[in-house]
Amino acid sequence: LLKHTFSQFGVQTTFVDAHNLNEVEGAIKENTKILYLETLGNPNSDIPDLDALISLGHKYGLAVIVDNTFGTPYFIRPLEHGADVVVHSATKFIGGHGTTLGGIIVESGKTNWKTGKFPTLSTSNESYHGVAFADAVPDAAFVTYIRAILLRDQGAAISPFNAWALIQGTETLSLRLERHAYNTKKVVEYL
């Protein structure tokens, strides 16, 4: 996605070792807009220093987007660490049964989208009555833009049945993850 799909839209991605802050900082360029990271890296489940990376991103005026698919909101809450946007693949733990493709985007409401790095959000959008999303909804400019423009133009919306299936998973999320934690503790104690 980041390397191949986004490049088709003119988005360049630089991959770095998230455990090497000097490497991360060295990769930040004048045109860098986003620092994207995972709370639990795939495929190794490595855990980066979330606070240090978020602080570094903000030092350079970047929006920090955290993929919390494997961390889940039950175990890790990136917004409490200062992340600007958190994304989840709802297909995995949130849905809990792997039958439905879906995702979640949560915005902190604290991001200044008017820094000059995000003209899509901070300037007038003629296809939406001239609205500048960062002015009209400063606490939710990113998610409102996605909903008002990207959903309208690209149609990435799940069916009502799939939405229902994901809701079924959220009803047992805390119970399932509590059990995961309990079982993990037992395995660690045994080893």
Regions found by a protein language model. Give the residues of each.
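Conserved PLP-enzyme active-site core in the AAT-like
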Residues: 1-191
